[in-house]
From Swiss-Prot:
Essential cofactor(s): [4Fe-4S] cluster
Biological processes, Gene Ontology terms: dimethylallyl diphosphate biosynthetic process; isopentenyl diphosphate biosynthetic process, methylerythritol 4-phosphate pathway; terpenoid biosynthetic process
Active-site residues, Swiss-Prot/TrEMBL: E187
Record protein name field: 4-hydroxy-3-methylbut-2-enyl diphosphate reductase
Length: 398
């Protein structure tokens, strides 16, 4: 499929909207009530520090809603205001935050059912309104909805769209897209649908396996077994790893994406030499500014003298998970929670250790003075962070 031609056609359709409805003022009070926090504003004004009795809270200097998330949520609210009685569907969670998605359900926004990773669009009819979430949607989903006569409201983050443009450039120039991301993540699924030939690598270890194969150090059968579900149809590592372009899922760890880019540049330089390098390697900066800011703020926060760190965000949120990884890399006691209700009145916390199931830890707050660092993923409202802080205040108010 010529994805660029399809997008041009879709963008000119009267049933496609990616700019909202000019109703920002009408929904502003609803958004403020649901997601903003005067307490968080006060803490920001106080140097990101709150002192309350024996509790000191230190906030990261960049956390919570990014502008892409704010835009997507606002557009969803505007959509319901603009279509007060129509059936409205959304192809996935608008963002990875349970409270925000629950608010949409309360507004009678319907979620497309998926089973085994396959979405069932049979429920969607001609004239229905369908919201595409901040992560985007695959080009095949867009085509299906367009052909079905739906009103498409596209809240895809512009940073995600930028990555789509990048992999389309790779395709046009007959380069294979190496996508640093999680194979089953909605954003990576969408990005790969706009690519031609592609291979998804999760981390630096997987990237090294690919680099080794390029340099003749791998076994084809083992390689294909490892990446069978992470590559385009009919992928041939002997042919398709000769010309590479690097892109990424925008919420991945910035430092790792950069290292993967440098790894493949060195690999292609070693194989083809400096004169031929540009014929075999392309690199574009597809790292989201907001992701980078939150990760840098986290690196600063973990340099503070902290007793523990609370990371707030959906358990399926990639950018939140990477914030947790930063805390772990510094050896700081850290707890990833998705809602304030994970903190119990008995000083227990139900959290998700990295790569593990939920776990309840008792007496997680120590006696005496306690310094708690707090950050949150790009899909977490300030109001949720406020409620977490209030829980900590209640537990330390002896």
């Amino acid at each position: 499929m010529d994805t660029q031609a399809f997008k041009r056609s879709l963008h000119h359709s009267e049933r496609y909207n990616r700019r909202g409805f000019g109703r920002a003022n009408e929904v502003a009070s609803n958004l403020e009530k649901a997601y903003q926090s005067s307490l968080i504003g006060s803490i920001r004004d106080n140097g990101y520090v709150l002192q309350h009795g024996r509790l000191q809270v230190k906030l990261a200097e960049a956390f919570g809603f990014c502008w892409g998330v704010e835009r997507a949520v606002a557009m969803a609210y505007e959509t319901r205001r603009h279509y007060p009685s129509e059936r409205i569907w959304i192809t996935n969670e608008i963002i990875h935050n349970p409270s925000v998605n629950e608010h949409l359900r309360e507004m009678d926004v319907l979620f497309i059912h998926a089973e085994g990773g396959v979405k069932d669009f049979s429920c969607v009819s001609d004239g229905d309104v369908v919201i595409l979430p901040a992560f985007g949607a695959t080009v095949q989903e867009m085509e299906l909805l367009h052909e079905r006569g739906c009103h498409i409201i596209d809240t895809t983050c512009p940073w995600v769209s930028k990555v789509w443009h990048t992999v389309e450039k790779h395709k046009k120039q007959e380069f294979t897209s190496i996508i640093h991301g999680k194979v089953k993540h909605e954003e990576t699924l969408a990005t790969s649908s706009f690519a031609g030939t592609y291979l998804v690598v999760l981390d630096l270890d997987e990237a090294q396996l690919v680099a080794d194969y390029i340099l003749g150090q791998g076994d084809r059968a083992a390689f294909m077994k490892r990446f069978a579900k992470a590559c385009s149809a009919n992928f041939d590592p002997d042919q398709d790893l000769q010309r590479l372009g690097v892109a990424n899922q925008t919420t991945m760890l910035k430092s790792e994406t950069e290292e993967i880019g440098r790894l493949f540049e060195r690999t292609m330089l070693r194989k083809y030499g400096p004169i031929e390098l540009n014929k075999h390697f392309l690199s574009f900066n597809t790292i989201c500014d907001a992701t980078e800011e939150r990760q840098q703020a986290m690196f600063s926060l973990v340099d503070e003298p902290l007793d523990l760190l609370v990371v707030i965000g959906g358990f399926n949120s990639s950018n939140t998970t990477h914030l947790q990884e930063i805390a772990i890399s510094r050896g700081i006691r850290s707890f990833h929670i998705d809602t304030p209700e994970r903190i119990g009145d008995n000083n227990s916390i139900q959290h998700k250790p990295l790569g593990e199931d939920l776990f309840i830890e008792s007496n997680f707050l120590p006696a005496g003075s306690v310094n708690v660092g707090i950050t949150s993923g790009a899909s977490t409202p300030d109001r949720v962070v406020e409620h977490v802080i209030q829980k900590l205040i209640d537990l330390t108010s002896d």
